[in-house]
Every structure is written in C-alpha cells, then in structure tokens.
Amino acid sequence: MNTVKTVRELRAAVARARGEGKRIAFVPTMGNLHSGHAALVTKAAQRADFVVASIFVNPLQFGAGEDLDKYPRTLAADQEKLLQAGCHLLFAPTVEEMYPDGMAVQTRVSVPQLSEGLCGASRPGHFEGVATVVSKLFNMVQPDLAVFGEKDFQQLAVIRAMVRDLNMPIQIIGEPTVRAEDGLALSSRNGYLSPEQRAAAPALYRTLNGMAEAIRRGQRDFSALVADGQAQLDAAGFRKDYLEVRHALTLRPAQVDDRDLVVIAAAYMGSTRLIDNLYLHLEEQTA
C-alpha cells in the first residue's frame, strides 16, 4: 500500500490503476480506524480491483465546541489496519492541501431537507461540511464506487442524494454497522468513554432494538414508543439529543403505513455523543 499526501500524487496513482483496466473503489475516513472501518475496506476490495482510502479530519464538518482538536490522529496504526484490510492507496492530505485558499472562501455543497433535523438540528453546518469534502474527494479520486457505514445513516442518505442530484457516476454502497459483542456500535468516539460509561453505553442499542421489535410486532403508536424508549435511555444515564422513528428513505417522520423505517438516535453519555440506528423493512402491514 502506498501513501500519498497531494492531489497530484493521488490522481497519478489512480490514473495508473485505471489505465490497467482496474475498477476503483473509495473509502473516505477521518482515521482512528477500528474494525468497522476495516469492514468498509474489505467490502470495497470485494467489489473492485483497486481500493483507495482517505484519512482527513475535516474541519469543515466540526462545529464550535466539538472535538476537532482532540479527535485522535493515529496515522501509523491506521496505515497498518488499511493494509491488512486490502487497501492499495491511502490519501492523507493536510488541511492546506484540501482547502488551499482557506475554508472561508471554499465553495460549499448543501443537500437541503435530508440535512435538516436529526443530527443536522444539533450540528448546524455539519452535513454541508460532509457533502463538501466528500464531493471534493469524489472529484479527486473519481471512483467507480464508494463504501460508507450505515451507522451514519443520515450521512449516507445525504451522500446518496448528493450523488444522484449532481449526476455523479458513482455507486454508493452501504455497509451494515459493526458492533461490539454487547451491541454497542463501533465508533472512534467510544474511546472517550470511561469504563463506567462504556458499561452503560450498550443501553442505546438495546433501546433501539426493543423499539424495532415492538414495531415488528405491530406497534404503530410511534410517539408512545419514542417516549418509552427515551425513558429507558434516561434511566441508563444518557442525555437526550434525539430519538425518532423515521421513514428510512426520506427521513420524514414515520407514518403508520410506511414499510421502510429507521429507528434512529443520538445521545450523550457524559460528554461523548453516540449515534446508532436500526433499519426495518416490513414485508406485510400488521394491525
């Protein structure tokens, strides 16, 4: 696996691979990699001949008071994990390489509606930062396909919409959430949790799973379901950001006759913000 730091080097390496007739896959990350990221790279390697990953902690998607400065930078360990997972090329640019004229004058990409609400409500500008950096990376790599984790469900919806609306010829693949044995979704931010907080954190998954099971059994009073779920999270020591049942494709509030649903949440354990979701496809409408 080679590591490059400039757009010119990146494009030259990708051009060589494409000139050899190889199908190109891309996995963008912010580093501090775990088994969930490795699963994305493995999926990419299964679908393509040449896998490009990026590591870039994107300042444009962090708001005031968020963890930009303390977000772990672990390049050497990340390189080893990417190599083991089947990555061929790592792009690890500086902020100056990505935003040479500065972020204040950077052209922005905004995906309305899908970026609003849920994480967008408590993190204004976040998805604009995500869409902007991902569109830049897509233009730099020009992959045939890109792989994203389903844990970031709203982000995946935003990226799919951006690719569709801007006519980008890129297949977007979602990879199921990788979890610890106790159900906690793997996240780079789990490392911020104290041992006591880590022991309590799986309650987020248990709550979502219980809500999903109730829906499968026919529960359609989503307001009551959310209220019960929130009480469980409160009892486990979480501080609320949001807990919702939404239509999985549009992210609008769920309606009783919807077949594709997502139970989705963000909550704070101490100062650490955790997100998770469970997707449901209902084959038959139940009473």
UniProtKB/Swiss-Prot annotation:
This is Pantothenate synthetase. GO terms for molecular function: ATP binding; pantoate-beta-alanine ligase activity. Catalyzes the condensation of pantoate with beta-alanine in an ATP-dependent reaction via a pantoyl-adenylate intermediate. It holds the Pfam family Pantoate_ligase. ATP binds at residues 30-37, 149-152, 178, 186-189. It comes from Pseudomonas entomophila (strain L48). The keyword Ligase applies. It is found in: Cytoplasm. InterPro entries: Pantoate_ligase (IPR003721), Pantoate_ligase_C (IPR042176), Rossmann-like_a/b/a_fold (IPR014729). Its main location: cytoplasm. Its EC number is 6.3.2.1. The active site is at residue 37. It catalyses: (R)-pantoate + beta-alanine + ATP = (R)-pantothenate + AMP + diphosphate + H(+). One of its GO terms (cellular component) is cytosol. The keyword Nucleotide-binding applies. Homodimer. Beta-alanine binds at residue 61. One of its GO terms (biological process) is pantothenate biosynthetic process. The reaction proceeds by a bi uni uni bi ping pong mechanism. Keywords: ATP-binding, Cytoplasm, Ligase, Nucleotide-binding, Pantothenate biosynthesis. Belongs to the pantothenate synthetase family. Pathway: Cofactor biosynthesis; (R)-pantothenate biosynthesis; (R)-pantothenate from (R)-pantoate and beta-alanine: step 1/1. Gene3D superfamilies: HUPs (3.40.50.620), Pantoate-beta-alanine ligase, C-terminal domain (3.30.1300.10). (R)-pantoate binds at residues 61, 155.
